[in-house]
Amino acid sequence: TVIAVLAATHACENKLQTAIMAPTELLAEQHYMNFTNWLSPINIKTAWLSSRVTGKRRNAELERIKAGQAEVIIGTHALFQNDVEFNNLGLVIIDEQHRFGVHQRLALREKGVSRNTSPHQLVMTATPIPRTLSMSVYADLDVSVIDELPPGRKPVTTTIVPDERRNSVIKRVADACSKGRQVYWVCTLIEESETLQCQAAEVTAQQLSKL
């Protein structure tokens, strides 16, 4: 994310807009908040587009983007819709690039090509398979791999616990929270599915909050 911010800043210094696309509204909104907090002190204007941005607010954002008043535009698939016009798109950043199809990534890039420019692209992923494939499929891209832990980062210990010991895991989570520490509980789905028998984040959050 820091690399993406620095790249966007460099584009802004050259009077070019940056589009940052994420696969989910949650991730895109996190990026919007972070980028706004980091860039607003240096007078770089951000904009936000997603399916939740509708009506007058959406029209206002579209006008800012078209006029070049928004320099860094963050959003989801909404970024490459037909009514989105960039003033001078020079950089496209795609987070979790394996979550987007080729035509979707191309549609966003074409927003800059239509202005007689070819935007630079920065694609990011933390998933091993797309990262490995990129070295053979994307022969025209430079690949950077971050293979070192940040200074001071403690090693992670991975332990497999059967579902029968779920209560003991919950107890360890409660103990950690009582000490003011943070716990990440990752689920396969966000909402319950009628076809997939997988743990849903919304249901799990409700269950844990009652303990």
What label would you give each PLM region?
Residues 1-211:
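Inter-lobe coupling/hinge segments of SF2-like helicase ATPases
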